[in-house]
Amino acid sequence: MANREPGKTGESAEPVLLSGGNPQIAKGDGDAPVQAYLAAMPGWKGDLGRRLDGIIARTVPDVKKAVRWNSPFYGVEGRGWFLNFHCFTKYVKVAFFNGASLDPLPPGKAKDEKVRYLDIYEGGFDETQFAAWVEQASRLPGWDGP
């Protein structure tokens, strides 16, 4: 079987974009698959993804990264995943897995009472508040899924 880069299929040099423009990136651990995801995010979302990743890495220097279900996940060893994000057509959805414990609460509710969302549209977001949520979330028990 030929070696392939994460998120690339067949002879195509471009990653496959799924529904809403979310990049299809193979499951993987570490920074490399996350960087592949960020590079494949379309248009303005790519710049946003790199900003989110940078804020997370600066705020949580020992952050653990992975790609699962075509989304980058961020966590702390021994505490689980605290955040992920996903591209949609008009925005990027950030999920805080223990977001109901953050102060102030991220604005979006989820079916799971613990989870809170932040939908980021083109044009910017409050980076200071995002960094504060990341810092808080990284200290809380996270999701211990795969």
Give the label of every model feature segment:
Residues 2-146:
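Charge-dense, helix-prone N-terminal extensions
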